[in-house]
A protein has these predicted regions:
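Helix-loop-helix connectors at the membrane interface of multi-pass transporters/channels
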Residues: 1-4, 75-78, 105-135, 171, ...
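Membrane-interface loop-to-helix entry segments
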Residues: 134-186, 220, 243-248, 373-386, ...
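Membrane-interface "cap" regions at the ends of multi-pass membrane proteins
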Residues: 1-47, 53-60, 67-69, 470-545
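Hydrophobic alpha-helical segments of multi-pass membrane transport proteins
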Residues: 171-175, 319, 373-404, 416-431, ...
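C-terminal membrane-solvent junction of multi-pass transporters and transport-like membrane proteins
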Residues: 6-8, 12, 163, 331-338, ...
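TM-loop-TM module centered on a large, flexible mid-protein loop between adjacent transmembrane helices
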Residues: 75-77, 82, 114-119, 123-124, ...
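Helix-loop-helix junctions that connect adjacent transmembrane segments
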Residues: 7, 42-43, 122-133, 162-297
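Extracellular loop-to-transmembrane helix junctions
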Residues: 29-132, 246-249, 451-460
Length: 545
């Protein structure tokens, strides 16, 4: 029987996790907004990578290799800052996904005709869309279907993500590079000056800072797939590898795609909705195939599918894992036969659907959308402040805990990387709260703008606090959950604190009762094991997964 259960263990490859990471962060459709800034966009992307993307990847890699049990961000923040903040991170992530997709959904309706060979009709429709509610309903049905697919298990949506990114981002990017070279070789003049001076951003006070913040935010999400770390055969080695490959691929998709768009389309002709399709048409025309844009548009849909299934699964998967430890009512904890929290996932897509219809049907809703978008930004970046803070604190609280990957430079390196991440996150939070120039027409006044955002943030954090307090007064623990206790619980502490133990978390969590139940095998805070034991622990057996 044991062998049979082991054979059912579902694993995903490094390639699959890498593509899942890339689908969360990068896509050619995201490049259009930055193409307004020409070659200077390279500088913005480089600054964003140095100040936020790389620190996030480095920190997530260390945390995942030191604390590779189920839970992702919940595990890491819980080890460093406690259960309350850990639950807050998961709920922020879950709400962020629901709100973000709900707000973005109505914009898809205007581009529906680009899936047909009539480019001119597609442009006219994008400029003056009709039957938007009906078309949006079609997209929402597609999203519900993709959520249904995501409930079929990690292996199913991992394959969707893998092939979706390859077909929908990497192959179109290669085609763009080749055809852009042909386009230039045919004697076409680039729409931007190609010189080192073009790399220097034009200073426009708050406008320049806001753009930088937008680039930082475009890099968020690479850590989300830590939810699936136990589906890797050797998570301590494979997770960092997937993270670093993801960083390189995402950066290349951002930079190369953005520069090609800026070269092909003059700044004044760039349209957020359909400029990417225009680029595909222009490039296709260089080889006598203007209809090529339609092929690439359908390919981009594959990337959208990858993004949706990964987003619909990741946050709910982590929340469902933690929920069984006593943090969610039993109804939300229930998993289907594929071990997916289907009820949580359908609740999330239902909320997204409601928001999408509200955004589309309520008149003069622009101000509401702006406020909701900025609230999401503030909450999501606060999530990263907590992650970076937990990382630094764990360097002091659990200095000897083995991590197969460690941010180099000792405590100085930890403060440098974590500090840059915290400062970048706070910088973006301040810019999100800072009233934009169009605030009067969209919201009313700067005071109302700032007040509403802060109130909405407080409401979400309040919901997190109330749910955590309720969990302490209700017996929501599932005794059959597979969520390991925090190390500080195993060591007999009431909350995270300083210990000198060097026992790997894989050893400490083995054969323990699940979180929320009495500790079965306690360890002392100063327990020590040999180097040989530590090395052996880096190759977990399937039963530990």
């Amino acid at each position: 029987m044991a062998d049979k259960s082991k054979s059912k263990q579902v694993y995903i490859s490094v390639l699959a996790l890498t593509m899942m990471n890339v689908s969360m962060v990068a896509g050619l459709a995201n490049d259009v907004q930055q193409s307004f800034y020409g070659l200077a966009s390279i500088t913005y992307f480089a600054i964003g990578a140095i100040c936020f993307f790389i620190p996030t990847a480095l920190v997530a890699a260390e945390l995942a290799t030191g604390w590779s049990q189920r839970g992702g961000i919940f595990r890491w923040v819980g080890e460093g800052l406690g259960k309350g903040w850990a639950l807050t991170c998961l709920l922020i992530l879950w709400f962020e996904t629901m709100l973000n997709f709900g707000i973005a959904m109505p914009s898809f309706t205007a581009t529906v005709l680009f899936y047909t060979p009539n480019y001119d009709a597609a442009v006219k429709f994008a400029q003056n869309p009709q039957h938007e509610v009906l078309i949006m309903t079609g997209f929402i049905i597609l999203y519900w279907f993709l959520t249904f697919l995501a409930t079929k298990g990690v292996k199913a949506f991992a394959n969707l993500a893998k092939y979706g990114v390859i077909i929908g981002s990497l192959i179109p990017l290669v085609v763009m590079i080749i055809l852009a070279i042909v386009w230039v070789a045919q004697g076409h003049q680039p729409a931007i000056p190609i010189s080192p001076k073009g790399l220097i951003p034009k200073w426009n006070c708050m406008g320049t800072l806001a753009l930088a913040a937008g680039v930082f935010f475009s890099y968020t999400g690479i850590d989300m797939n830590a939810a699936h770390i136990k589906q890797l055969r050797h998570p301590e080695k494979e997770f960092p590898k997937a993270m670093f490959i993801s960083v390189i691929l995402a950066f290349l998709i951002f930079v190369i795609g953005t520069v090609i768009i800026a070269i092909i389309v003059p700044e004044k002709q760039i349209n957020i909705l359909y400029t990417l399709f225009t680029v595909f048409r222009v490039l296709g025309s260089t080889i006598g195939m203007p209809w090529l844009y339609m092929v690439l548009v359908w390919a981009l849909l594959c990337n959208t599918i990858a993004m949706v299934v990964t987003n619909m699964a990741g946050p709910s998967f982590m929340l469902g894992q933690a929920g069984g430890s006593g943090f969610l009512p039993h109804w939300f904890q229930k998993k289907n036969k594929h071990k997916m929290p289907a009820r949580l996932m359908y609740t999330q897509i239902a909320g997204m659907t409601i928001i999408a219809y509200l955004v589309k049907l309520i008149p003069n809703v622009e101000g509401f959308v702006v406020l909701l978008t900025q609230t999401i930004t503030v909450l999501y970046l606060f999530y990263y402040v907590l992650m970076f803070t937990a990382f630094i604190k764990l360097r002091y609280d659990q200095p000897n805990r083995p991590r197969s990957f460690k941010v180099p430079g000792g405590k100085f390196g930890a403060w440098l990387v974590g500090g840059i991440g915290i400062i970048s996150s706070i910088f973006c939070i301040v810019l999100a709260i800072y009233p934009p120039t169009q605030v009067k027409s969209e919201v009313g006044s700067p005071v109302v703008y700032v007040s509403v955002i802060l109130i909405l943030v407080a409401v979400v954090l309040g919901v997190c606090f109330v749910l955590y307090q309720l969990s302490k007064h209700h017996n929501w623990v599932d005794p059959n959950n597979k969520f390991a206790p925090f190390t500080w619980e195993i060591e007999g502490l009431k909350k995270p604190g300083k210990v000198t133990s060097n026992v790997p978390t894989t050893i400490m969590s083995k054969d323990q009762n699940p979180m929320g139940m009495p500790i079965k095998r306690p360890y002392k805070p100063d327990a020590q094991v040999s180097e040989d034991v530590i090395k052996k622990s880096e190759t977990p057996s399937p039963s530990e997964n």
